[in-house]
Curated annotation (Swiss-Prot):
This is Serine--tRNA ligase. Consists of two distinct domains, a catalytic core and a N-terminal extension that is involved in tRNA binding. ATP binds at residues 262-264, 349-352. GO terms for biological process: selenocysteine biosynthetic process; seryl-tRNA aminoacylation. Belongs to the class-II aminoacyl-tRNA synthetase family. Type-1 seryl-tRNA synthetase subfamily. GO terms for cellular component: cytoplasm. It comes from the Bacteria. It is found in: Cytoplasm.
Length: 427
């Protein structure tokens, strides 16, 4: 969430940022609403101050045996007490109205983010590796998985409906191996702390990371009002909610392997076959909490950590800098890692790494204290996929497909597969 004081002082900057995101200017209406709010608040505070002063004056008048003045003051206090509830309610209403509008305004992009309307404006930052060259025909992951007998979409549909998958046998083991490999890499080499967070969270947690109130339709809600997490970013980032951290201990880096749940409300007709777009999928998440001075560098570091997964798996990919029109609601800058899928003859997103500045921290009231400075500041938050496990499985089986329909196991995963080097058709 943006700071209304910052908006008052940077109205043109906000409107320019909104224009880059394809949104209408809002600064004038926000500042006008804030002026009304502050006028109401000032009036309320003056009423409260006068009530308190008059109450003290009653005692002084009584001590001086000035009953006429005392009665007059009592009447004034009574009148103020009667008027205060309505004034307090009006102040709360205007505060809530302003907060609601602010909570729906996207973050301000960094200056070096390319301007564009949608994914067509994204820019290739770098290409890593090269596309595989084979003599045999590439296949899509669902053709390979069903051919091996380890991927069952019809069975999943009978149990849960569309956009679910049953993995069995060696493909289930391969997906588990991928997740374990990623966690080991991030915890043992990249300095992240492994966390097993709740998969159900409250409204305020979803609000803190920016999923609510704007994106409720993309989420699954339980009958008791909790939400299934769409990403472990939500619980990991909210671990510092309402906390004051010691600045000397920053950055904090957390990682988790969790199921993620998304309704895919806006994805009708897209990727209806296979595992690319599921209601439930596994993902390794990376979250960093740092300060303003180091958050941009931390973004580069986090992206490199996610890239290392793909490098060690021997996968060809590209890094995309997302443009203003394709960036997420809470992000100031985002890099997407897009892995090459031979079966689709296309690059597909497998990781998204974003720096959010203090946007989420303001919503969570997450701050830090430095020994060198007085007071507290909001932390800066970052999140990224390190990486999506299901999509990594897709990439591995499409890129490591053999002519006989079997799939070679990437060398880095062999120890996690008990020495198995090839996934072959179920007997």
């Amino acid at each position: 969430m943006l700071d209304i004081k910052w908006i008052r002082e940077n109205a043109g900057v906000l409107d320019n940022a909104l224009a880059k995101r394809g949104a209408e200017p809002l600064s004038a209406s926000l500042i006008a609403l804030d002026e009304r709010r502050r006028t109401v608040l000032q009036s309320l505070q003056e009423m409260q101050s006068r009530r308190n002063a008059a109450s003290k004056e009653i005692g002084a008048a009584m001590a001086q045996k000035n009953s006429e003045l005392a009665e007059k003051l009592k009447a004034e206090v009574a009148e103020l007490k009667d008027a205060l509830p309505a004034a307090e309610e009006e102040s709360r209403r205007m505060e809530a109205e302003l907060t609601d509008i602010l909570s729906r305004i996207p973050n301000v992009p960094l200056e070096d983010v390319p301007v564009g309307p949608d994914e067509s404006g994204n820019v290739v930052k770098r290409l890593v590796g090269s596309k595989p060259t084979w003599n045999h025909k590439p296949l899509e992951h669902f053709e390979i998985g069903e051919g091996l007998g380890f991927m069952d979409f019809e069975g999943a549909a009978r149990i849960a409906g569309s956009r679910f998958t049953i993995l069995k046998g060696q493909l289930a083991r391969l997906e588990r191996a991928l997740g374990q490999f990623m966690l080991d890499l991030h915890t043992q080499e990249h300095g992240y702390i492994e966390v097993q967070p709740p998969l159900l969270v409250r409204d305020d947690a979803m609000y803190g990371t920016g999923q609510l109130p704007k994106f409720a339709e993309d989420l699954f809600r339980t009958t008791d009002g909790r939400w299934l997490i769409p990403t472990a970013e939500v619980p990991l980032t909210n671990m510092v909610r309402e906390q004051i951290l010691e600045g000397e201990k920053l950055p904090l880096r957390f990682t988790a392997l969790t199921p993620c749940f998304r309704s895919e409300a806006g994805s009708a007709g897209r990727d209806t076959r296979g595992m690319l777009r599921q209601h439930q999928f596994n993902k390794v998440e990376l979250v960093s909490l740092t300060d303003a001075e180091t958050s941009v560098d931390e973004h580069e570091r986090m992206t490199a950590c996610a890239e290392e997964v793909l490098k060690r798996l021997g996968l060809h990919y590209r890094v995309m800098t997302l443009c203003t029109g394709d960036m997420g609601f809470g992000a100031r800058k985002t890099y997407d890692l897009e892995v090459w899928l031979p079966g689709q003859d296309a690059y597909r997103e497998i990781s998204s790494c974003s720096v959010c500045g203090d946007f989420q921290a303001r919503r969570m009231n997450a701050r830090y204290r430095s020994k060198e400075e007085k007071g507290t500041k909001f932390v800066h938050t970052l999140n990224g996929s390190g990486v999506a496990v299901g999509r990594a499985l897709i990439a591995v089986i499409e890129n490591y497909l053999n002519e006989d329909g079997s799939v070679s196991v990437p060398e880095v995963l062999v120890p996690y597969m008990g020495g198995l080097r090839r996934v072959e058709k179920a007997a």
